[in-house]
Amino acid sequence: HIIAMAKIAKAQNKKVFIHVITDGRDVAPDCAAVYINQLLEVCDDDIKIATIAGRYYAMDRDNRWDRVKKSFDAIAYSHPSTSCDILTYLKESYDSGVFDEFIIPSSFDEYDGLKENDGIIFCNFRSDRMREMSSVFANKNFSEFETIKNILNLATMTQYDKNTPIDVLFPKDAPINTLAEVISNAGLSQLHTAETEKYAHVTFFFNGGIEEPMLNETRVLIPSPSVSTYD
């Protein structure tokens, strides 16, 4: 879908800069080159790969803003920057023992950061993992670190957070009669509890994409330990 979006934007006479987020958790830890090569096949003067970052940085969901900022800096300010191409950067990272999930954010030579009136499309459809990064650009009251406020258009593949003012390309159909809803309608009580890292799974996702607790639903959030990785 990223390639399709890039082609659509190019057809509208737009310059396209792709910001790659490497996975390494839901797939093999060192398979990013497979997908990057697919992107490179469509790259030309109008479509370029601008930055790279492992999901450890770009897809944090536990308020570790120091990580998010590293990815944001690469996207917004092209800092830091490397003179090598993306595949060389990836190989050098592997050679140093850093694999896809933890790829250190960097921009590439031909990218010079965001400019006034640029637009951003968030192509990730994993809502809980993109709330923090999207809020950096869209939330005018964001205060965790200095950001930029002059992005002309913002859009997401799906709704990440209904409180974040971003256009949604593909709104979700809300499921009905979820387990939490049935329990609540039966007049029973329920408890949803998890660590911060998985809190969205037992609340937002479990309740069919609804943020607010059901009637007689209690939620308990246990702060996840502040560690680099849970391995």
Where are these regions (language model features)?
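Feature captures the catalytic ectodomains and active-site-proximal regions of enzymes
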Residues: 1-231
